[in-house]
A protein has these predicted regions:
Chain B
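Catalytic Walker B motif of ABC-type/P-loop ATPase nucleotide-binding domains
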Residues: 155-159
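Conserved ABC ATPase signature
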Residues: 89, 130-137
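Conserved catalytic motifs of ABC-family nucleotide-binding domains
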Residues: 151
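ABC transporter nucleotide-binding domain
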Residues: 173-266
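Conserved ABC ATPase "signature" region
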Residues: 97, 101, 108-126
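Conserved ABC transporter NBD signature motif
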Residues: 57-68, 72-73
Length: 372, 310
């Protein structure tokens, strides 16, 4: 009987174009849109080499050796162009360089706008001037001390990364998107309840007249829905990773586990709404879409700042929003080296799944109806 | 007794849908449940099938109490509900196979049963069609095939011909009789008296959840005082002659519309002969003339004072 119901449910659901659109095509289309819209987000915070025009009016080998250090290596700070003063002015005016360093007895910097690159140039020159002045003073007073001095910068803070991953803001949007896709699985849950509750559909009435335990039929049928949702989610992940080249880190096993848990919560959410809410299917569908989109919004799918606002102003909402729990589980998995935050999210999702499924069971187990 | 319901009471708030309804269906008969819309036919069926709760009464099927988990009873019951209940995503064959599979796990046996059911309802040429491609009549036939494919001993059909074209309706009615000949006991609900009169061996007329008459169609017609209805095509009849006609013995009402005079009589022998004699004696020129026996609608009308289709 399991094979019979399972196989036919697969057929029915896979041929349901509306269902497949909302649960698979729509998330993939949205992911494509996100990729186009947020493609440059990760690059805005990255550092590029600063182009500088160097005008040497007097030789200064000491300064030039320092500059050489700044332009060498795997991650150079500056890219120098040794030019004449008029050429330097042209390059600056055209925006090809961030500033002009003029080397004479004393160094000077000319910029024509303010910005991070110009600030770095200023700090560099200030620090050089400060160090050479200090060294000059010490050399004048006691050259021996200067010989013994260690010019390595003293750092009073220690860098301890919370993550092994590189920061990528757009990932947060994709996490919320995956969470939304899992919760669109709620349509499957709604369908399953509609198919087993004789007071909700004529097909369910027919099924209730068959010599078959209705909870078994419900379970077999729901397993078919769950299987399809998992396959759809795997296809979405494959699309994100292989086509859109989204890097979800190296914990792919846990990511898949999280999708399994999220899909379970999503389907049980649909069953919960279908069994608890009175009204026709359109009302329930509207409610499912509304609740999922609202949850996704609060989880930062449309504006990342909303997630932070919720964290600051109404932190309890983070835990009451299952879409956020799921998105945050992915986030925690990728960004944090410890699993505490991840486990809290997964536990929250499982609690929701138990509450949704338990409530659905209490309604679905009913064997007779007041009316059909 | 295949089916026995005693003293069923079902209330929806203040509305009494079934008012101490009792019925018995014997093995091998086609039992008709006739009543206007809202009379309680479908509610009675849903109670019998243990789909809905009822406030009072008990139901036995095949001599055993009916319950939602009486799976050994349910496997011998076939149900064709009023509304078409099939999957639009499955073909005709797949739909019948799916519902049959809920009763018959063995694939080989099922294959044969499904083929037989599809042939039986005349959908052999449509087996790969999806329901959306079928006309209303064909869809009804598919609905029937889904309910009977597992060869049940008791088949309950709840208004299976609503909104069906005459050709499909005849096919459905012939099919029901054939199923009965093959050994199935049938419970057939309808508000179409002609259908019930045509195929049912025993009929119960219900109204407002109560049984108001029960028996064979002849038994039911004997219960009322109304005799035959005589219709005469006349070419010129005066008001005075119509009045005289109405005053003849055993004539209850006379109405005239255009050239047609409709005469309703009480039960009596030779009513037609007496009417003809009167027409001749009055030298009334006439054309066609025919007489009809009372219908179940007349039975319903006399008992309740309203038309069956009101």
């Amino acid at each position: 009987m399991f094979r019979h119901i399972f196989a036919y449910r697969l057929k029915v659901l896979l041929r349901d174009k509306t269902m497949i659109f909302w649960t698979m095509i729509f998330p993939i289309a949205l992911a494509t849109f996100f990729n186009l819209a947020f493609g440059g987000l990760g690059e805005s915070g990255s550092f590029n080499v600063i182009d500088v025009a160097l005008v040497e009016t007097q030789p200064n080998p000491q300064f030039m050796s320092v500059l050489d250090m700044m332009t060498a290596g795997e991650t150079p700070l500056f890219a120098l162009q040794k030019v004449t003063a008029p050429r330097g002015e042209t390059l600056l005016a055209d925006g090809h360089v961030a500033g002009i360093i003029t080397v004479s007895e004393s160094m000077s910097l000319k910029v024509n706008q303010s910005g991070i690159r110009q600030s770095i140039l200023k700090v560099f020159l200030d620090r050089y001037a400060h160090t050479t002045r200090t060294a000059g003073r010490i050399a004048a007073e006691d050259p021996q001390v200067l010989m013994e001095m260690d010019f390595t910068p003293v750092v009073f803070t220690e860098e301890r990364p919370v993550s092994h991953a590189e920061m990528d803001i757009k990932l947060s949007y994709f996490y919320a998107l995956i969470a939304m896709a899992c919760f669109y699985g709620s349509f499957f849950g709604m369908e399953e309840v509609n198919l087993i509750q004789a007071n909700l559909s004529k097909r369910a009435a027919r099924l209730n007249m068959a010599p078959l335990h209705k909870l078994k039929a419900f379970l077999y049928s729901s397993l078919a829905s769950y299987s399809i949702l998992i396959v759809e989610m795997m296809l979405l992940m494959a699309y994100l990773v292989l086509i859109l080249k989204i890097d979800f880190g190296n914990q792919i096993g846990w990511v898949i586990f999280t999708i399994f848990v999220g899909s379970l919560t999503g389907i049980s959410f649909g069953g919960f709404i279908a069994s608890m809410v009175k009204g026709d299917e359109n009302v329930k569908t509207g409610l499912l879409i509304g609740a999922t989109m609202a949850g996704s919004f609060l989880a930062g799918m449309m504006f990342q700042n909303v997630k932070h606002l919720v964290q600051l102003k109404a932190p309890i909402l983070q835990y009451l929003n299952p879409v956020n729990l799921l998105a945050d589980a992915f986030y925690a998995l990728y960004f944090f080296n410890t699993c505490k935050r991840y486990l809290i999210n997964i536990a929250g999702l499982l609690v929701f799944a138990v509450v949704f499924a338990g409530s659905t069971y209490l309604v679905v187990r009913r064997r007779k109806y007041a009316s059909v | 007794m295949i089916l026995e319901a005693n003293n069923l009471v079902k209330r929806y708030g203040d509305l009494v849908a079934l008012d101490h309804l009792s019925l018995e269906v014997k093995k091998g008969e086609i039992f008709g449940l006739l009543g206007p819309n809202g009379s309680g036919k479908t509610t009675a069926i849903n109670c019998i099938l243990s789909l809905i709760k009822y406030d009072k009464g008990d139901i036995h099927v095949f001599g055993r109490p009916m319950a939602p988990d009486a799976y050994d009873l349910k496997k011998d019951i076939g149900v064709v509900m009023q509304d078409v209940a099939v999957f639009n995503e499955l073909t005709v064959y797949e739909n019948v196979d799916y519902f049959c599979g809920l009763y018959v796990p063995d694939k080989q046996t099922r294959k044969q049963l499904v083929e037989e059911a599809i042939d039986f309802v005349g959908l052999s040429d449509y087996r790969k069609f999806y329901p959306k491609k079928l006309s209303g009549g064909l869809l009804r036939r598919l609905n029937i095939a889904c309910g009977i494919a597992h060869k049940p001993k008791l088949i309950i059909l709840d208004e299976p011909t609503v909104a069906v074209d005459p050709q499909s309706r005849n096919r459905i009615l012939e099919g029901i009789v054939a199923l009965n000949r093959q050994g199935a006991t049938i419970v057939y609900t309808s508000h179409y008296m002609e259908e019930v009169e045509k195929i049912c061996s025993r009929i119960m007329i219900i109204d407002k959840g109560r049984s108001i008459a029960e028996g064979t169609k002849d038994d039911l017609k004997k219960m009322i005082s109304l005799g035959e209805k005589i219709t005469v095509e006349v070419f010129g009849i005066s008001e005075e002659q119509l009045e005289k006609l109405e005053n003849l013995p055993h004539i209850s009402t006379v109405t005239c519309e255009g050239n047609l005079v409709e005469i309703r009589s009480h039960k009596s022998k030779n009513n037609l002969e007496k009417v003809l004699e009167f027409i001749k004696s009055e030298n009334i020129s006439f054309g066609r003339i025919y007489s009809e026996l009372p219908t179940l609608n007349d039975v319903f009308l006399e008992i309740t004072g309203k038309e069956l289709r009101d």
